[in-house]
Amino acid sequence: MQTSIDPVFAGWDGSVAQARQLQQQLAQRVALRDEVSAAPALLAGFDVGFEDDGQTTRAAAVLLDAQTLLPLETHVARVPTSMPYVPGLLSFRELPALLRALALLARTPDLVFIDGQGIAHPRRFGIAAHFGVVTGLPSIGVAKQRLAGTFIEPGGERGDHSPILLAGAQIGWALRSKPRCNPLIVSPGHRVSMQGALDWTLRTLRAYRLPEPTRLADRLASRRGEIELQTQPTLL
């Protein structure tokens, strides 16, 4: 497998085996406790798409007012795609672009939502956990599909949820965010508790399946239209 090693992965030899080993090591740094302000001012959503037949990784960042959930900033970062998709190693493919997008924000978010897994991952170190450990920012993973673990299908109403278990331990939540839609896979990434990940995701839901931070980032990453910014943010 041909890879271009980003400085954020210093010490990685580019192999799948060592990438998995690094995940297991870095997973020990994940903090599953709530370290988010009770009244955060800024949230951010991140998602990734691809251009040029997959040769370019396109990372979208959207900064939102935490009270109104209206967007304040949007940015897109583009970097050459460094490696092919390997299940469970998404961060080694997408994290360099996400960090570039984060650097474009004029203000630092208090809490970050990533389109992808937090600790709901075979080695409990998905892209939201990796992002959080590298940046130090509280993070939550919100994925559209399950990667690891099992769960009982939650009820059909908005807000219904059930725990996702792996080897007898909870790694996330299956959350029915919208009736007649498949559940989201929600899990803490870093500096957020299991319950906190669920609560914050519920707080940021509106009329759509995805919470506003990742919904807007998904829209920007997939080039489905411009996002109108809130020009006068609410002061908390």
From Swiss-Prot:
One of its GO terms (cellular component) is cytoplasm. It catalyses: Endonucleolytic cleavage at apurinic or apyrimidinic sites to products with a 5'-phosphate. GO terms for molecular function: deoxyribonuclease V activity; magnesium ion binding; RNA endonuclease activity, producing 5'-phosphomonoesters; single-stranded RNA binding. The record marks Y85 as: Interaction with target DNA. CDD domains: Endonuclease_V (cd06559). Its EC number is 3.1.21.7. One of its GO terms (biological process) is DNA repair. InterPro entries: Endonuclease-V (IPR007581). Mg(2+) binds at D47, D115. Its cofactor is Mg(2+). Belongs to the endonuclease V family. This is Endonuclease V. It comes from Xanthomonas campestris pv. campestris (strain ATCC 33913 / DSM 3586 / NCPPB 528 / LMG 568 / P 25). The gene is nfi.
